[in-house]
Amino acid sequence: MSDAAEPQPTASFRSDREFREVMDRTFTLMSDDPEMGPRLRDADTPQRFEFTDVDMVVNIRSGEPGGPNLAWEWSDEIDWEPKVKMTMSSDTANRYFQGKENVAIAIARRRIKAGGDVKAALAIMPITKPLFAHYRAMIASDYPHLEV
């Protein structure tokens, strides 16, 4: 039996509000990080993430000059076009940010649906690798029920 049939470990957010709070903190961690933030700004890869189980959409892009490295809107009412579109559950996002979900495998197994310039998204993945440790520390400290 292949591991495609094996259930993924899950840890659920207590509410939609908690999910958004954790994701806002996660994007802030990326934006404020002295290594990740400038590299993500320079990569200039606008992305749209849809989280199906919490019925939320966030669009992320490089920040304006002189401002934060990243900007995001919890809406599709934006004045930029995403290069990459990803659809996943909040549980998949939580596993990914803990370093427990490989995006390429998740796409192949349909846990993540990807559209647009997927190569651009995969190209910035190495930039965000340091986030995993920061995210795990935040989860362990403030949201231990989300550890997987």
Region roles according to the model:
Residues 2-148:
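Feature captures hydrophobic
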